[in-house]
Structure formats: C-alpha cells, structure tokens
C-alpha cells in the first residue's frame, strides 16, 4: 500500500541555523517506516511538523506520541486519559489485556494508578497502551524504546506489526537497530535534510549504506 508524505518545512526563531526541509516522499512498503539520524538531525521536528500540518485534515491526520510524555499524558491516570479522548465507553477487558501485554503485573490496578507515581519506563509503556487502544489510522512514535526493556521492545514490535497489518500507517523515530531492521522503509536525516530514503531491504543490501552514520545503535 503506497503512501505519500507531504513536503515539510520548519524553522525556529531561537535557532535560525537549523531548517527542516523535506520534499514530498513516497513510501512503498507494507510495514512501518523508520526515521533515523544522529541527535539534532531533525527527527523529532519531522514528526512534530507532520502531525501539526495534518491536524486540521481528519482524512490525513497523524497521531503523534512524543519523546517527552508530559505533553501527552495530560490526565491523572489511564482510565481518565482514555475517557477524555473517547466518546464511547471503554472496553475494559480489551484495555486490561493491552496493559498486561505491555508487561504490567497488576493490569487492573494500573487503570487508576497515577502517572506521576510511575517510573519513566512505566509511563512510556502506559502511553503505548493508550495509543494501541486508540488504534489511530496514522501514528508517529518518537523513540518508543526509551526506558523500555529488550523483552518489552519485542512485544512492542509485535504490536506494531499487528497495527500495520490492519492498514495503520506507522512512522517510528528510533536509534534501535531492531526497529530499523524490521521496518519497510527508512528515511535518513542529516541537519534537517533528507540524506537518503528507500525500502529497508534495498538500503541494507547496499554496501555503501551505514546505519551507524545515522546514530543507529546495535547494543540494544
């Protein structure tokens, strides 16, 4: 299923030397897309800008889960968060199943457990529970592996493949080699510009393509 990303442009008044410039991009893979680049290359700006320009177009809206969860977890707990986002009643059995899948030993108790009392990794997983419950048609995850164990990352990868199998378009911003290698497309950023893009299988088979150049880590 081909998908086209619009051209993007972004600059900041407090950092005039950085400009994000991305042409219209065609993504041809069936799975998720990975955006890679060293710190400061514009990955988060790419995700934020795509979400911003699509916000007023319901047919093309991208749902964005940022690195910094204070911008996402606005309620006191998961139950209140989802109640504020949804117009229909929460499917508790489905939600509890998702909480358990993401590694929580007391899924029932976590429904009303305050976000502020959770560790960083727990808050990250709880935000992912929220996203997976909502099942948006287009989803951007900004470094979802932060604070998450290797075992939990495997669960996350499985959930992502399930989402893309339901025709959800997913973009992941990541330094994690496992996430990059299992993607269908890769977008490489250097200083706010597209350095390379293409299907993952083609890029990884190219001897001139080096993941390390874009800050991808193989130790996770």
Task: Describe the residue ranges of each PLM region.
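Conserved beta-strand-loop-alpha-helix hinge in the C-terminal portion
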Residues: 193-217
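H-loop/switch region of ABC-family ATPase nucleotide-binding domains
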Residues: 173-175
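A short, flexible loop at the N-terminus of ABC-type nucleotide-binding domains that lies
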Residues: 1-5, 9-23
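Walker B catalytic motif
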Residues: 114, 143-145
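Conserved ABC ATPase signature
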Residues: 114-118, 122
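ABC ATPase nucleotide-binding domain signature region
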Residues: 44-87
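Hydrophobic anchor residue at the start of the ABC signature
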Residues: 128
């Amino acid at each position: 299923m081909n998908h086209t990303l619009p051209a993007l442009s972004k600059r900041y008044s407090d950092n005039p030397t950085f400009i994000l410039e991305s042409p219209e991009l065609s993504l041809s893979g069936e799975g998720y897309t990975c955006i890679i680049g060293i710190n400061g290359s514009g990955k988060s700006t790419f995700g934020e800008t795509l979400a911003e320009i699509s916000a007023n177009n319901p047919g093309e809206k991208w749902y964005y889960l940022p690195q910094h969860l204070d911008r996402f977890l606005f309620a006191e707990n998961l139950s209140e968060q989802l109640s504020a986002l949804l117009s229909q009643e929460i499917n508790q059995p489905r939600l509890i199943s998702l909480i358990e899948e993401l590694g929580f030993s007391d899924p029932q108790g976590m429904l009303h457990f305050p976000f502020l009392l959770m560790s960083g990794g727990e808050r990250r997983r709880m935000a992912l529970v929220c996203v997976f419950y909502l099942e948006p048609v287009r989803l951007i995850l900004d470094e979802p592996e932060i604070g998450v164990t290797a075992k939990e990352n495997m669960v996350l990868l499985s959930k992502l493949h399930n989402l893309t199998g339901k025709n959800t378009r997913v973009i992941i911003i990541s330094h994690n080699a496992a996430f990059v290698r299992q993607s269908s497309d890769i977008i490489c950023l250097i200083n706010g510009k597209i350095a390379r893009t293409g299907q993952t299988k083609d890029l990884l088979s190219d001897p001139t393509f080096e993941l390390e150049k874009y800050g991808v880590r193989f130790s996770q």
